[in-house]
């Protein structure tokens, strides 16, 4: 007893947690020391103890134990703030989509990680025995990441493609998820459940395939006598000691090992723990060990190459079925990998940088000499510290020291004030994540319809020379100019000369948007094109009047187009049939006392004037009323005044019939107050009663005037009128017309009445009969209007063209807008115009121009000497269709007859073509081409672009622009007037009241204008600008007649920006046409930030910007689509190729192993491998001479690829904490790399090209025949390797039975039944097992011996020589080089 006690006293007491691996070690030690029986007894006791303790503890888990981390709120807020800034940068085009995705992922990942690290300290302080806390690190159930999801935040999730969803789940499972978060996380969670089920079967199948490959490998000899080995080096700390010792224990040395001159281990000696420790301490030279790779036997393995048997701890027995053991050892942990797969449920974990946060508020100090400035990978400035850096933060009373590890980035400056928990440094992610990089393509889709432009040169990808895939050479912006495309399948007929006017019928097509004017009547369309236009010259104009076209003639106040070619010859260029009216500028108009109500020049929808059309009109404010009333024309006789009905609307053009030429000198307006009420409303006054001013009529209406009330009930509404005036009850004798009222001129009196009065003004007498018997007379006041020719419209236009001799006349006509006795209803607060003064256009018919049925009008804006003048241009032309008839061009006519110029009038009005040279101006991003569509025989799909309302913004005018008071007021009320109100389409001005205000383009200071014009190099601008004209169609869209790409701009699509008059003096940027402007760029001082877009019009004090969205793209990105192409929303715009770290979830587990074993290509070869091979091929042959260098190179390549395969597989298992001995994996890898493919170059007599043969067999055959056999080493997947074995029975029992057996029969293959499976199938004795060698007949052995020795000696001798020769050379040349540089991984196991 005493002895025992004393022994016990000497024992060391270990107080340590024991996990699985420690337990394994303990058991193996116990077996070594005490044997099996004793060990099992000890383990029993341990088990009993464990169960007792577990019963006593009884941990329970309740929902109250899930405590959210307090710092979560502000952390999430912080991250959201950063994301917001990022979003803004992306919007301005400073950051491209991939950067944005990456940064937002990093922001959220860092937040989530920081929360996870806070979790344990938080629990430790508040509740150390919290079951959730204990669960997170005990390893019994769950891990830190799962607990983090319960109490921290769920974080980023992967989507089904393995991509990151950049919307993080901010809640944890305790708080509960919102609907969106729930849907995002569903995928990962479900995948976890499904995967567990699917992967179990996967793992089983993997085991089956592995066993299939290696089932025939059995230990058959003691020593194959190989001299090769694989060197493993413990030096330089390349390999961790744990892995180093694992690799070595149980192996056999291939060479003696010397320590100086002393030999510490001999060849063929098994390595135990003692020897390994000695190697580690001595840091000896690289140790060469034998592995299954180096074994020389073809279809089995020798004891020494295999090493120790893991079960007994001594060399493996002969006859051991090591192949099957290897297959099962690799396959079995697969099930564990499966079960651990998706507990984290698709949560993203990647290696991003960790953050260091300041512990408190204070001033930060560090040694500036130890850091040097750099930028983070997101381009933010930072300091890089190369060694450990101590940072002190001085708060009020205490100093905090923070240690920042080397290779970290400091994000703050010295002496800067930091707030508590502010990020002050980033610690670089560990290197381990570098393996999980993969290349990903990210497509960027366009957010809106529009036209694509880019601001740099673009390469065509070589394979798509004629396609639309382009590579960007440098970082640049892609712009999508907003505007909806509208495809049309017509080929446009470009048979127009420069500056010709052209009817837009030929430019039409079926829109994607249903426009309310498309003609869908096919018969009418066929009728239109039935006559053959091109056969003979004919001037016939097809009659459109029978087309059921819907015409709405909106009136357009002055339509002007932005810029014509800047040739001032246009002033002098008066051709026949064309005349140009210069419009006066504002100053000239201000001198005359013309009221600013404005003259509207009305150009009809399609720009065509018939004879007697109204060209312009002027609404005289004197004839304007606010209230409702009735119009009466003078006396009953003067009825032949021109009324509105007599204007004939012909194809949308108002024109006068000349027969109504009579003039009226006066008309009368009888005011009355009218309220139109819904039928259900309750009225508080009776019919025929008399009310005073401001009487309550209905609940919310009061009368504005006093007088007689008349109530008329119609079907669905009530019309309530209040007539002001006097009421007379006349005697019987008064003869007042029963039906209508009578106008009484001044000076007449009621003769029969008792009191005889003179009437001073005109009055209107109306008889009212409230009941059958009685009636009374209402005498109502009348407003009299005289019509004079006082205001002459001619003052707007210079008198010159009115006396023009080229047969165009303008006449001035006044007409009354309302008919005699017509009641006029004014909507509240709008004024009613009673008389309109019109300018009527007419022209003479002379014999020559008999076909001039119509005139075209358009506005031209021309700058001369810095003044912008607007001209109205009117040309007398013939119909465009008769033009087409004049050109007897077969190809043109062919196109016409096929699908004609389909009359789907999307934009029924005339376009003016201005061609320029076909040269793309890269600087202005405005491609222009002379369009000869006639060369284009095949009908291509042309497209129109329709810009929609929301696409434009405008900069408000500045206060110093002389602006009309109306606009000023409206600006005060609402700074963003809808553009439609204040600015009609580009082309129409502001509404009539403030007609001139937007014409304030001629500055009062002529000098500045010229200065501006010099700056903005005008000549060039005029040649290049593409949008020559804007014309309107009836939807208020602006049509830009560009022959190849028709853009229909909506008024709102443009951003007007008004600049100061003296804007050149102030602004730093000179704005040029076509320039792209990003958002937030100020053009004028104190100008509001603009939307991003392209400048399409520069006036003297304003610019118009077409909205555009910038997308930043980096070099190497692929751009889809051509320059200037129309894109739809959702089209792919750019494809970025970028590397991302794979989500480090154990999605890798089994599939990764399978990927390696089945040799599926994973990703592109790493660059440094190629470089290594190149450098190897350069230097080695130089040292060894050519044949040897390449020979060794080839051998090393095979060895190296095998080693890297083993490392890859080990990595997956180790990452899961599964220990598998290398030799099991090596046996399998040996099988999949042992075949070679005979290549065709060296045709040999033995093998046919394309045959798969064992590597060793090929080498031996080559030596025996003394003839070179050319072959290539191939890597077979395990499935292919199973189907390429020596035995066809084994193959047939694996897959494709019928095919394999049929082929074998045809080829006459012989199965030598060497493996296990063949014998099992045929029911023979299995040729394995440790007692197997007794079965071999002794006499056979004797016979074989002499022969065998001869052979082996012969081969061995030769081979030894070669190999030793290699070896010595190799060692002498390379040992110095290879093992001092980290190219170590060439030879030796490396945990890469």
Swiss-Prot record:
Pfam families membership: RNA_pol_Rpb1_4 (PF05000), RNA_pol_Rpb1_5 (PF04998)
GO biological process: DNA-templated transcription
The UniProt record lists the keyword Metal-binding: yes
Keyword vocabulary terms for this entry: Chloroplast, DNA-directed RNA polymerase, Metal-binding, Nucleotidyltransferase, Plastid, Transcription, Transferase, Zinc
Chief localization: plastid
One Gene Ontology MF term: zinc ion binding
Compartment(s) of residence: Plastid, Chloroplast
CC terms in the record's Gene Ontology section: chloroplast; DNA-directed RNA polymerase complex; mitochondrion
Keyword Cell membrane: no
CDD domains per the UniProt record, alphabetical: RNAP_beta'_C (cd02655)
Catalytic activity: RNA(n) + a ribonucleoside 5'-triphosphate = RNA(n+1) + diphosphate
Cofactor dependency: Zn(2+)
Enzyme class: transferase
Cofactor binding mode and count: Binds 1 Zn(2+) ion per subunit.
E.C. designation(s): 2.7.7.6
Binding residue positions for Zn(2+): 224, 295, 302, 305
Subunit details: In plastids the minimal PEP RNA polymerase catalytic core is composed of four subunits: alpha, beta, beta', and beta''. When a (nuclear-encoded) sigma factor is associated with the core the holoenzyme is formed, which can initiate transcription.
Function comment: DNA-dependent RNA polymerase catalyzes the transcription of DNA into RNA using the four ribonucleoside triphosphates as substrates.
NCBIfam families: rpoC2_cyan
Family statement: Belongs to the RNA polymerase beta' chain family. RpoC2 subfamily.
Protein name per UniProt: DNA-directed RNA polymerase subunit beta''
Organism: Solanum bulbocastanum
Highest classification ranks of the organism: Eukaryota, Viridiplantae, Streptophyta, Embryophyta, Tracheophyta
